[in-house]
Amino acid sequence: MEKKRIGIIFGGRSGEHDVSLLSAASVIRAIDKEKFDLFYIGITRQGKWLAVPQVFGRDIDGDHDITADIIENGSWEKVGEDFNPGDLKKYVDFALPVMHGPYCEDGRIQGLFEMLDIPYGGCGVLASAVAMDKAVSKELFESAGLPICAYELITADEAKHDNDKAVERVEENIGYPCFVKPANMGSSVGISKASDREQLKAAIELALKYDKR
């Protein structure tokens, strides 16, 4: 039986780029290569798509596939070749995005797969977009009558023009200590604990480096 071709897509433009490399390396090591052919595609921090060839290293026991290693340590960009994402369907039967944060977990790359008519792993476009945006997901949870923690949404525009009012609102409705996080990031990137006003302002500034709200 002909082996299915799995496209492992990693990297990306988000602040979780490095986390994605670790995840992709783990997935590559775990997949049964007797059953599947793997096609590696890395996306740089600048958004450039690169096809990464299978790489072998030699030691006393012979040649070994070290592709997962070069992805994990970041040297894949040196061996990758320019790749047009519109050609993806020519090379893979199934896409497995192993990426985190914006541009992957928020429905955008899922939309690309849908347009290219490529089956893919993970949630669909709508579920990804809603789940990634913590403000939207909390509104939906509330409307469904589910219990959630108290929260306040601060946009970049509000923080820029009326930050003191935003801080006062957090102090009044949540208090200290509180946690501040970007609305559209995963892992623990951009998250801070604030125990006073100065820490809260610094936490808001940090979170807004990763997201507009």
What are the roles of these predicted feature ranges?
Residues 2, 6-10, 14-15, 22, ...:
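Active-site nucleotide/adenylate-binding loops and adjacent lid/helix of ATP-dependent enzymes
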Residues 1-121, 125-126, 130-132, 136, ...:
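ATP-binding N-terminal substructure of ATP-dependent carboxylate-amine bond-forming enzymes
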